[in-house]
């Protein structure tokens, strides 16, 4: 194991947010320099490269602090680089994020701003939150695979929308509209899948589903509050199940997905919580899963929580943004109306008095 390197290692995914991350990196670099943050940088060149970079940086180069520049997918790769090495305890490692683009669901849980200069100040301050990490075991052509996640995972419609969205990304189409278009297309074509869910060894669900989300944070899918009661340091995974529901009912409640109220407004929504979650599909291997925007392979899926296992840099207090005070209708009228005769006389009297006294 190498001697500890005190600098941050900035891992930049230049293709995040349809290339915005790479385009903005020179600006972000200068902001970090201006803030007095000492760092080295590495640019990813292909999918999952960040996993290799981070793992090697810990084991061979002694880095203990990482800044992820990109979106939730980049964060996920950095997390997997940290958790797929066994040389340095993950509790000794600190991670910060510099969110780029429109998704960035993890940062919403902690009110991390999108302004680069504000994020740099947060990183400089160094306030950390000891965060839980999810561990997912799934199957790829019969082989067991493991993937770690910071925020959330999903299957059913969730995974299908993720797949469609990623195809649109490759075509250079980005943003929230991209996600909503994918959502509508997938709702119209999705086929209900029968699953069974076990939580801490007890079967709690055996029915058809539209979608299932599993995670330790509240937001998923570009700002949707799919797990509104999730707490990222309670050692538990939250599960939200949307059963078979009519297209019209689901469409009528899409807006409620963004504030979390859908769990109380749609009878077909169930929520659970536990340390170990197992999802089995009928027939076997008929479902795929996604974690933070990356499509993975087949069921069954086993989820477990690694409690309080990494230090994440967050604001000590929410960043306050000054809002311009809105003028009242009376103030607007006064600002555009000519002065009245009485007002003009008063101003003249004041002026005369001033000149006389001087």
Feature roles, as predicted:
Residues 1-69, 80, 117, 319, ...:
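ATP/NTP phosphate-donor binding region
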Residues 3-6, 129, 144-145, 188-192, ...:
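Short gly/pro-enriched beta-turn/loop segments at secondary-structure junctions
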Residues 22-24, 79-82, 108-110, 225-226:
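Short amphipathic alpha-helical segments
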Residues 50, 73-78, 105, 131:
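Short glycine/serine/threonine-rich phosphate/pyrophosphate-binding segments
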Residues 154, 158, 213-227, 295:
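Glycine-rich phosphate/pyrophosphate-binding beta-alpha loops
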Residues 199-201, 206, 226, 231-232, ...:
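ATP/nucleoside-binding phosphotransfer catalytic cores, i.e., glycine-rich phosphate-binding loops
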């Amino acid at each position: 194991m190498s001697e500890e390197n005190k600098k941050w290692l900035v891992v930049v995914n230049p293709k995040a947010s349809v290339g915005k991350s790479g385009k903005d990196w020179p600006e972000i670099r200068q902001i970090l320099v201006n803030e007095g943050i000492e760092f080295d940088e590495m640019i990813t060149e292909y999918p999952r490269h960040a996993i290799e970079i981070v793992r090697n940086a810990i084991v061979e180069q002694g880095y203990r602090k990482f800044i992820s520049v990109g979106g939730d997918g980049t964060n996920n790769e950095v997390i997997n680089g940290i958790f797929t090495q066994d040389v340095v305890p993950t509790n000794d490692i600190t991670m910060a994020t510099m969110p780029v683009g429109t998704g960035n669901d993890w940062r919403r849980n902690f009110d991390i701003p999108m302004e680069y200069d504000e994020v740099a100040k947060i990183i400089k301050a160094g306030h950390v939150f000891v965060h839980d990490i999810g561990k997912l075991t799934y199957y790829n052509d019969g082989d067991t695979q493991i993937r770690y996640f910071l925020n959330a995972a999903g299957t059913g419609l969730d995974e299908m929308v993720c797949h469609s969205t990623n195809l649109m990304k490759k075509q250079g189409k980005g943003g929230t509209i991209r996600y909503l278009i994918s959502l509508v297309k997938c709702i119209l074509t999705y086929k209900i899948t029968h699953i069974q869910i076990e939580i801490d060894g007890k079967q709690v669900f055996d029915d058809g589903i539209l979608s299932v989300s599993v995670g330790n944070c509240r937001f998923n899918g570009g700002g949707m509050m799919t797990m509104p009661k999730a707490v990222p340091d309670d050692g538990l995974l939250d599960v939200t199940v949307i059963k078979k529901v009519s297209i019209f009912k689901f469409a009528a409640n899409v807006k409620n997905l963004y504030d979390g109220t859908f769990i109380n407004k749609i009878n077909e929504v169930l929520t659970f919580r536990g340390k170990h979650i197992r999802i089995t599909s009928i027939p076997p291997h008929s479902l795929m899963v996604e974690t933070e925007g990356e499509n993975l392979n087949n069921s069954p899926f086993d989820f477990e929580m690694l409690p309080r296992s990494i230090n994440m840099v967050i604001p000590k207090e929410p960043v306050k943004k000054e809002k311009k005070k809105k003028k009242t209708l009376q103030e607007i009228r006064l600002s555009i109306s000519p002065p009245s005769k009485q007002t003009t006389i008063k101003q003249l009297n004041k002026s005369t008095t001033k000149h006389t006294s001087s």
